[in-house]
Amino acid sequence: MASLRVSVLLVAASCLLLGSGLRAGPRTLVLLENINLRETHSLFFRSLSDRGFDLSFRTADDPSLSLIKYGEFLYDNLIIFSPSVEDFGGNINIETISSFIDGGGSVLVAASSDIGDPLRELGSECGIEFDEDKTAVIDHHNYDISDPGQHSLIVADSESLLKAPTIVGKAPLNPILFRGVGMVADPDNPLVLDILTGSSTSYSFFPDKPITQYPHAVGKNTLLIAGLQARNNARVVFSGSMDFFSDAFFNSAVQKAAGGSNRYAKTGNYELAVALSRWVFKEEGVLRVGQVSHHRVGESSPPSAYTVTDLVEYSIVIEQLSNGKWVPFDGDDIQLEFVRIDPFVRTFLKKNGGKYSVQFKLPDVYGVFQFKVDYNRLGYTHLYSTTQVSVRPLQHTQYERFIPSAYPYYASAFSVMFGLFIFSIVFLHMKEKEKSD
């Protein structure tokens, strides 16, 4: 009887472990302004759950919050839906979030016109500057028909989106509904992405005050949604609108107030929000290097050292993460460089089945070289692969017996020898005339 109980307990424990393993997905901490956001933004959170994300909902001021424990990150992703928070709870602060990003973590931030200093400081760390508190993006030409009168319920056309299907999705979107604070990008930060910009008639200011000074953001410099991919491939997305992710904006009809504008039954917010979440949480645009090989043409294994002017073949396997599986990447602009200090050879790789390959002739220069693939494209993780090889000069037995470029020198040498031979014959057989008395 006792052994039966032990067996039952072992089976139950195994089932629990198996179930927890099946449920395990990317660990995501969601910091909320208040717990009601789980209901008002349920469609967005449900889309994450349906894709296997393990969501942990906490209020932003929870005193038990922790992002790092014993030097290890407790979560893979961070969502901040608490724009007006003045202090995060527990041991979470801007330094902790910056360390999380430096460690490769992904962060999604939603702000609003009521924005606190922590989010403003986090934006500055990532090259994004929010406008002042209580300001909003205003557009007197592109506002929704349901706007209450301040013209801050903006209708953004899909033409204002970044031309990067990996980030914003491939399907054409309906107009985007936006209400929130404007942002500007640091012009000295080349890593910032202008994902969604305002129209040429938009600006950011206090909606209930007359304009007395030049606005913080004007025209297409006004960012509604911005992104960042760090050099370590960590990704961050900032949205100036908390309502952008809400169920109300997902299901709302949209129509510009201008006469003759088309009416759409639904906004494009949901499709864009899902595409952004897939990119920022590294479900899209993730590349990796598979097998790399190089050898002389006609051989199958790399030599200990190449010889100058060898004809070599280089191949590399590049894979892309798609729906949780690694599949061959399809690209036509991948280049290979053969580098010593500067590139001696730069050529495009051609797709051959599931790999990219190319044949080329080594330069007539010896030294230590690298086969280098450095692929950095918008929306994709930075792909970098190097393989170091040695290139030696020709051995004495490998040189040609006569070098065509040296024919003039050969001719000059033989002509001198021939001239000396003729001179010697003439000199030896020449007889001086006898002097007469």
UniProtKB/Swiss-Prot annotation:
Top-level taxon: Eukaryota
Location relative to the cell: Endoplasmic reticulum membrane
Cytoplasmic side of membrane: 429-437
Transmembrane spans: 408-428
Lumenal side: 25-407
GO biological process per UniProt: protein glycosylation; protein N-linked glycosylation via asparagine
Assigned GO CC terms: oligosaccharyltransferase complex
UniProt keyword annotations, A-Z: Endoplasmic reticulum, Membrane, Signal, Transmembrane, Transmembrane helix
Bilayer disposition of the protein: Single-pass type I membrane protein
Pfam families per the UniProt record, alphabetical: OST48_MD, OST48_N
Involved pathway(s): Protein modification; protein glycosylation
Extent of the signal sequence: 1-24
Family assignment from sequence similarity: Belongs to the DDOST 48 kDa subunit family.
Role summary: Subunit of the oligosaccharyl transferase (OST) complex that catalyzes the initial transfer of a defined glycan (Glc(3)Man(9)GlcNAc(2) in eukaryotes) from the lipid carrier dolichol-pyrophosphate to an asparagine residue within an Asn-X-Ser/Thr consensus motif in nascent polypeptide chains, the first step in protein N-glycosylation. N-glycosylation occurs cotranslationally and the complex associates with the Sec61 complex at the channel-forming translocon complex that mediates protein translocation across the endoplasmic reticulum (ER). All subunits are required for a maximal enzyme activity.
Quaternary assembly: Component of the oligosaccharyltransferase (OST) complex.
Designated name of the protein: Dolichyl-diphosphooligosaccharide--protein glycosyltransferase 48 kDa subunit
The organism of origin for this protein: Xenopus tropicalis
Upper classification of the organism: Eukaryota, Metazoa, Chordata, Craniata, Vertebrata
Gene label: ddost
